[in-house]
């Protein structure tokens, strides 16, 4: 088998949040967004702007804050009440540029720059650092007042994504492909007790938790890795291929490891079947995957399958059917086969549920366009392991655990 490069999220065009006169709301938006990414484990560098009200004769006291260290740089000039000059202190901005240079050197996951404004439009301020980050392929997020939009377009050569000033727009720009890294960041390490691979399912165990993932059909018939391959592995290392590997079996084992962290015995939620979330919808419902009892629960659904039967659609139909749908039920197998990001992107505007025992039960996925998570928590691991080794399907799981549904409220 050839050695493949690691799976990495696609590059992002520099994001520019466009706003009218006044930027206080946008400053707060960038501050909140970068803070949330940092809480999730992403490496974010650069500066955000914070404004603290009146200072002597100035309208505001402005600071640039290094998002990685919290160090603040004063960028206000007190020019007096009658001054018509810019109140931004170029020396303070130059001092703050060290935060950007460090983030570029460390290859941050995201570089945030409070704004592209008058200084940058004239090649000053943080312009050099912005260009360096873009040239290095580091994702860049900034804000641009409408008066400087033409200058920004010239600065980037038109290679930019113009964003509306709201959180949903920022998360759409950040992209669904980054959900894998997001899930991986949340995993706490633990010794892996056992990895079981059956004909249809994979199970990863720690001392206190169990995670599942469907075995990819592409791995059937291939020789399985020897058990010692995972001997002494930590859960985080075992989960890494979920975000980095193109090998179907490695990726699926990684997803099962993710679920060994997230689908722990303490998770609680509704016990409803994930397909029942779409009962009674007036608009079209698209289902990715031929779930058990699908015809009974959603008789009018448009069903997409890798191996379609009569009245079903092939895999390529996803981008044709999902736009404009009211609801979309997506099999959790899409996480391991790496089709989930494009399916979520095509489902914008629909109510989306990720359904199946391989669904990670974590709110981390809600920001990426998932509204409900219908997964499984194992309670009798030995009994379920026997089912998996016997080649059993998910229909036999319910006696050995509980189905749990979480909602984005």
Positions of the model-derived regions?
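Electropositive, gly/pro-rich neighborhoods at or near active sites that engage anionic ligands
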Residues: 2-54, 67-68, 171-292, 388, ...
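Structural motif
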Residues: 16, 110-112, 141, 286, ...
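Helix-adjacent hinge/juxtasegments
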Residues: 65-106
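Short Gly/Thr/Asp-enriched flexible loops that form oxyanion-binding sites at enzyme active sites
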Residues: 121-131, 340, 344
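Short, conserved loop/helix-junction motifs that constitute active-site signature segments
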Residues: 131-136, 298, 321-323, 344-349
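C-terminal functional extensions of proteins
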Residues: 154-173, 353-409
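Histidine/lysine/aspartate-rich catalytic loop segments that bind and position anionic ligands
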Residues: 293, 298-321, 326
């Amino acid at each position: 088998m050839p050695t493949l490069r690691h799976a990495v999220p696609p590059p992002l065009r520099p994001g520019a949040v466009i706003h009218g006169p006044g930027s206080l709301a946008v400053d707060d938006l960038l501050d909140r967004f970068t803070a949330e990414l940092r809480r999730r484990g992403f490496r974010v560098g650069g500066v955000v702007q914070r404004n603290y009200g009146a200072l002597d004769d100035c309208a505001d006291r402005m600071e640039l804050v290094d998002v990685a260290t919290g160090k603040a740089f004063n960028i206000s000039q007190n020019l007096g009440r009658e001054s018509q000059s810019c109140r931004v202190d170029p020396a303070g901005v130059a001092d703050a540029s060290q935060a950007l240079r460090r983030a570029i050197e460390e290859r941050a996951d995201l570089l945030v720059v409070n704004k592209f404004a008058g200084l940058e439009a004239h090649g000053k301020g943080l312009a050099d650092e912005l260009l360096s980050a873009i040239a290095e392929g580091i994702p860049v997020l900034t804000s641009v007042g409408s008066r400087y939009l033409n200058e920004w377009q010239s600065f980037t050569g038109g290679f930019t994504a113009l964003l509306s000033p709201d959180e949903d727009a920022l998360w759409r720009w950040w992209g669904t492909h980054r959900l894998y890294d997001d899930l991986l960041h949340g995993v706490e390490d633990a010794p892996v007790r056992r990895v079981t691979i059956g004909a249809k399912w994979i199970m990863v165990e720690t001392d206190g938790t169990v995670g599942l993932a469907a075995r990819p059909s592409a791995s059937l018939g291939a020789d399985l890795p020897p058990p010692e391959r995972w001997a002494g592995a930590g859960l985080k290392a075992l989960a890494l291929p979920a975000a980095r590997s193109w090998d179907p079996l490695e990726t699926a084992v990684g997803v099962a490891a993710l679920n060994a962290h997230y689908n722990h015995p303490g998770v609680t939620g509704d016990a409803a079947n994930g397909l029942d979330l779409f009962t009674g919808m007036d608009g079209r419902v698209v289902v990715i995957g031929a779930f058990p009892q699908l015809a009974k629960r959603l008789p009018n659904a448009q069903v997409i399958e890798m191996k379609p039967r009569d009245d079903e659609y092939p895999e390529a139909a996803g981008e044709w059917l999902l736009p404009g749908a009211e609801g979309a039920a997506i099999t959790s197998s899409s996480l391991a086969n790496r089709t989930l990001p494009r399916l979520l992107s095509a489902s914008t505007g629909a109510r989306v549920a990720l359904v199946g025992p391989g669904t990670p039960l974590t709110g981390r996925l809600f920001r990426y366009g998932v509204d409900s998570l219908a997964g499984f928590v194992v309670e009798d691991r030995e009994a379920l392991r026997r089912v998996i080794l016997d080649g059993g399907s998910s229909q036999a799981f319910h006696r050995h655990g509980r189905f749990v549904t979480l909602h984005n409220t």
